[in-house]
C-alpha cells in the first residue's frame, strides 16, 4: 500500500508540472492572440478602401479589363495556396485547414499545384503525394508584408506565364478564440463580383431605392468626380496587384490569429483536464492513505489481542 501512495504522489507531481507548462502556454497564446486580433482589425479598413477604389474604376469604365481578370482556359492546372501553422499544440486547427483544402481539391489532385505556407501543410500534402511546388516556412507570429508580397508576386508570375489557370486560397478565417472557420476562395482570375460592396452597403442601397432614388445613378454621379492618371487601366493594374498582396496579407494575419486562438483554447482544455486529473489522483491518494492507516490500526489491535 505504501508503494501505491508513493506512485500516486509521483503521478500528482508529474501532472502538476504539466499543468504549469500548459497554463504558461495558454497565457502566452492569449497575449499573442490579442495583438494578432488587433492587427486583423487594423488591416480591414485599408483593404476595404482598396476594394472600393477598384469597384469605382470597374463601375465607371465598363469595358476595362486586365490580365489578372482574364480566364486562362480550363486545360491549365490550378494553383492552391494553403496557410496553416509551423507548429502543433493548437488543437485541430492545422488538420482542419488541410482537410478543407484536400476536400476542395477532390479528384483534381494531379492537376493542382500547391503553395504551402507553414510546415504542417507542406508535410501533410507531401506525405500524400500532392504536387507541392513551393513552400514558405517559419512564418513570424506577427507577419510583415514581405512574405505575402513574395507569394503574390510568384503566383501572379505563374498566372501571367500560363503555368496555372486559376488560383485558390485556403486559410482559417478568424471569428473568435473558440471558432476558426477554414474557408477556400478563388483569388485568380479576379472578377468584378469580388469587389461588390458588402451586404451592409447593399442594404443601404435598398433603403435608398425605396426612397425613389436610383443607386446606380447615385454611384455614377459619385464616380464622375474621379479622374485617373495616366489612365484608368494603369491605375487598375496597380490596384489589382496591391489588392492581391493585401488579400494574402489579411489571410496570413487571420491564420495567425486563428492559430493563437486555437492554441489558447487547446492549452486551456489541457490545463482543465490536468486539474481534474489531480483531483482524482488526490482522492485516490487519500483513499489509499486511509486504507494504509486502517490496516496499521488493525495490525496494532490484533497484536494487542494476541498478547493478552
From Swiss-Prot:
Q: Which GO terms describe its biological process?
A: proton motive force-driven plasma membrane ATP synthesis
What cystine pairs are annotated?
none
Q: What is its main location?
A: membrane
State the membrane topology. Peripheral membrane protein
Q: Might you report a single GO cellular component term?
A: proton-transporting ATP synthase complex
Keywords (A to Z) from UniProt: ATP synthesis, Cell membrane, CF(1), Hydrogen ion transport, Ion transport, Membrane, Transport
User: Localized where?
Assistant: Cell membrane
Q: Which GO terms describe its molecular function?
A: ATP binding; proton-transporting ATP synthase activity, rotational mechanism
- Gene3D superfamilies for the chain: 3.40.1380.10, ATP synthase, gamma subunit, helix hairpin domain (1.10.287.80)
Give the matching InterPro entries: ATP_synth_F1_ATPase_gsu, ATP_synth_F1_gsu, ATP_synth_F1_gsu_CS
Q: Can you tell which superkingdom this protein's organism belongs to?
A: Bacteria
| Subunit structure comment from the entry | F-type ATPases have 2 components, CF(1) - the catalytic core - and CF(0) - the membrane proton channel. CF(1) has five subunits: alpha(3), beta(3), gamma(1), delta(1), epsilon(1). CF(0) has three main subunits: a, b and c.
List the NCBIfam families hit by this protein, alphabetically: ATPsyn_F1gamma
- Family membership, please give it: Belongs to the ATPase gamma chain family.
- Purpose: Produces ATP from ADP in the presence of a proton gradient across the membrane. The gamma chain is believed to be important in regulating ATPase activity and the flow of protons through the CF(0) complex.
- Stored HAMAP family: ATP_synth_gamma_bact
Give the protein name, as stated in the record.
ATP synthase gamma chain
**Upper classification of the organism:** Bacteria, Bacillati, Bacillota, Clostridia, Natranaerobiales
The gene for this chain is atpG
Amino acid at each position: 500500500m505504501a508503494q501505491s501512495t508513493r506512485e500516486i504522489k509521483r503521478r500528482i507531481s508529474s501532472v502538476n508540472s504539466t499543468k504549469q507548462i500548459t497554463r504558461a502556454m495558454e497565457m502566452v497564446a492569449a497575449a499573442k492572440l490579442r495583438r494578432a486580433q488587433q492587427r486583423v482589425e487594423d488591416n480591414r479598413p485599408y483593404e476595404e478602401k482598396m476594394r472600393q477604389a477598384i469597384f469605382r474604376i470597374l463601375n465607371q469604365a465598363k469595358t476595362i479589363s486586365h490580365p489578372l481578370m482574364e480566364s486562362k482556359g480550363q486545360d491549365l492546372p490550378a494553383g492552391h495556396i494553403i496557410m496553416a501553422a509551423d507548429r502543433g499544440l493548437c488543437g485541430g486547427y492545422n488538420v482542419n485547414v488541410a482537410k478543407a483544402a484536400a476536400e476542395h481539391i477532390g479528384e483534381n489532385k494531379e492537376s493542382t499545384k500547391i503553395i504551402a505556407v507553414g510546415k504542417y501543410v507542406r508535410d501533410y500534402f507531401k506525405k500524400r503525394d500532392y504536387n507541392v511546388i513551393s513552400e514558405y516556412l517559419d512564418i513570424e507570429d506577427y507577419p510583415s508584408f514581405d512574405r505575402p508580397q513574395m507569394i503574390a508576386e510568384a503566383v501572379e508570375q505563374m498566372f501571367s506565364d500560363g503555368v496555372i489557370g486559376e488560383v485558390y486560397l485556403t486559410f482559417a478565417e478568424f471569428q473568435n478564440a473558440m471558432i476558426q472557420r477554414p474557408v477556400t476562395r478563388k483569388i485568380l482570375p479576379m472578377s468584378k463580383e469580388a469587389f461588390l460592396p458588402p451586404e451592409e452597403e447593399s442594404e443601404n442601397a435598398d433603403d435608398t431605392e425605396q426612397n425613389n432614388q436610383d443607386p446606380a445613378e447615385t454611384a455614377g454621379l459619385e464616380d464622375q468626380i474621379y479622374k485617373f492618371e495616366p489612365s484608368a487601366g494603369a491605375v487598375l493594374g496597380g490596384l489589382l496587384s496591391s489588392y492581391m498582396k493585401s488579400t494574402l496579407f489579411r489571410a496570413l494575419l487571420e491564420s495567425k490569429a486563428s492559430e493563437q486562438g486555437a492554441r489558447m483554447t487547446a492549452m486551456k482544455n489541457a490545463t482543465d483536464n490536468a486539474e481534474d486529473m489531480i483531483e482524482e489522483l488526490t482522492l485516490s491518494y487519500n483513499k489509499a492513505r486511509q486504507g494504509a492507516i486502517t490496516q496499521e490500526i488493525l495490525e496494532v489491535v490484533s497484536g494487542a489481542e494476541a498478547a493478552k
